[in-house]
Amino acid sequence: MRPIPSILGALGAFATLSAAAPLESTLYGPGASHARSMLGSSFGVPGNQTFDYVVIGGGTAGLAIASRLAEQGAGTVAVIEAGGFYELNNGNLSQIPANDAYYVGKDLDDWQPGVDWGFHTVPQAGAYGRASHYARGKCLGGSSARNYMAYQRGTKSSYQRWADMVGDQSYAWENFLPFFEKSLHFTPANDALRGANATVQYDPAVLGNGQGPLSVTYSHYVQSFATWAQKAFLEMGLAVRNCFQSGELLGQSFGMYTINATTMHRESSETSFLRRALAYPNFMVFQSTLAKRILFDGKKRAVAVQLDTQGYRYTLTARKEVVLSAGAFQSPQLLMVSGVGPAATLQQHGIPLVADRPGVGQNLQDHIIYAPSYRVDLITQSALLNATFEAQANRDYHERAAGIYANPTSDILAWEKIPEPKRSAWLSNTTRRALAQYPADWPEIEFLTMGGFFGYQNNYVRDNPSDGYNYASLAVSLCTPRSRGNVSIASADAAVPPLINPNWLTDPVDVELAVAAFKRARDFFGTSALKPVLIGDEYFPGERVATDAQIEDHVRKSFDTIFHASCTCAMGKREDQMAVVDSKARVIGVDALRVVDASAFPMLPPGHPQSTIYALAEKIACDISGAC
């Protein structure tokens, strides 16, 4: 969707970093002990070794829980990560917020092997048999280095539902909230750089004490489209809310993002939790290393992890526990190749059965996204295709941490239930009854203002119009997905990609809601508030897409995932045969093994799961260490 900053800009950014301090100082920060002042002290050399805890996956949850276990004195901790530093393996692209749409398109070749696994789905019935690239972070930071950086929490009722599903009230809003706050280092908006008509509202009482490692803030740049969109949302009946961190979502707000408040670089679990943990003498990372299999003793206790570093095989032994944080696709995959999963699947691949858990890989839930687009009489990220504008934007970003490159494409997030009378007119009785099962505060649709062109989402960079116009879109995402997918294995070898079947848009309720959501996006562009800035009629898909059948057809062709895959190692009560982990994230049927990532969610809360993944990691770390 956006061009790469100029080579001079990229080199300038690197030169600034190099001149300021050696790499070790940059990563460790002030106050690091002399004994750990060399970067290599925190990175393991391949070979058989023993630790108290072995964490598989250096992603969003993995680095958070590993860092906390080391910090809280639980013992020695090793982290296994298949990738390396995204700052080195992806140029500036992963660090600059405005470049978050690189290598995330549906096309199977729109991926970058330095930071992405290159996974793709099996052909999707809900998308006319299309298989899609599904971006997943293969780097330190995992998908927190690949996501769109939105930081927002689910609703109070969604966490209450979680608590009820797993039989543990520690997941109810009031009890779970401290673990959200624990991660945060919140910085208020810089109004001087954000400009006019971009005032934010937030509740500081739910944003922690500022001692957490994870920087959350507002972008230093607000696209003009957002200020007009705010008026349009008000016209649609969506009131301004306080920052979406207090367990309430219905309404609109400028979004908070995981961005470094000083540099406007992406904040990930690597730049936050890992960099803090590098100073701990009981912490070690094995990067560029693939976990092949979890090993169990005769009592079904997880005792070690078999690894592969560029063909060299070795084992890390865990005295206390193995923590699996490989994500919604690879956590179930690794369980299955290790002998934990549906017995029939394991038998098919000749894998000795350790524990028959039929729920492993099932219950996959996800959010989809799509958008109509207009030409607008405003500066949007489309302007970055103009060389003069891009050069100035490059200077603004690298010299002042300002300008459009500091903006992660979306400014305002908004949520709603389809309002009456359109609800009765657009949705069938069956769909309305199904949606009535969700609590009153649980939204059905999310809106995201986007300063750019969306299109079919095959390849944002390649497909961005270069006709000199500025484009804006209103993306919509479904918050009540009822379609259920699954993850399975194609081989007993963890190096062979898993079989990913999100099963998007296979439930009729999802399909009806998807059509209604598209109509609401058109309502947005039809407001009187936006008339002064729209140029012509709807550009994409255009007025030829008019009937419900045509809208459904268009949605099926144009939607993509927003990369919220979850629930494939679902948490539940121990008596539930489909549950994979209990409320302490312990794998049912074996000992000394936990799953801590989005795969352990019992259900997908509305909105963006990043904050909940961090909170879950914080909570389970405290459960393990007992030192919180």
From Swiss-Prot:
Keywords: Cell wall, Cytoplasm, FAD, Flavoprotein, Glycoprotein, Oxidoreductase, Secreted, Signal, Vacuole. The active site is at residue 564. Glycans are attached at residues 48, 92, 197, 260, 386, 429, 486. One of its GO terms (biological process) is patulin biosynthetic process. The keyword Membrane does not apply. Its EC number is 1.1.-.-. Its cofactor is FAD. It is found in: Cytoplasm, Cell cortex; Vacuole; Secreted; Secreted, Cell wall. It holds the Pfam family GMC_oxred_C. PROSITE patterns: GMC_OXRED_2. Patulin was originally used as an antibiotic and specifically trialed to be used against the common cold, but it is no longer used for that purpose since it has been shown to induce immunological, neurological and gastrointestinal effects. Genotoxic effects of patulin with dose-dependent increase in DNA strand breaks in brain, liver and kidneys have been detected in mice. However, more recently, it has been proposed that patulin might also have anti-tumor properties. Gene3D superfamilies: FAD/NAD(P)-binding domain, Glucose Oxidase, domain 3. Belongs to the GMC oxidoreductase family. Homodimer. Patulin synthase; part of the gene cluster that mediates the biosynthesis of patulin, an acetate-derived tetraketide mycotoxin produced by several fungal species that shows antimicrobial properties against several bacteria. PatE catalyzes the last step of the pathway which is the conversion of E-ascladiol to patulin. The pathway begins with the synthesis of 6-methylsalicylic acid by the polyketide synthase (PKS) patK via condensation of acetate and malonate units. This is Patulin synthase. It comes from Aspergillus clavatus (strain ATCC 1007 / CBS 513.65 / DSM 816 / NCTC 3887 / NRRL 1 / QM 1276 / 107).
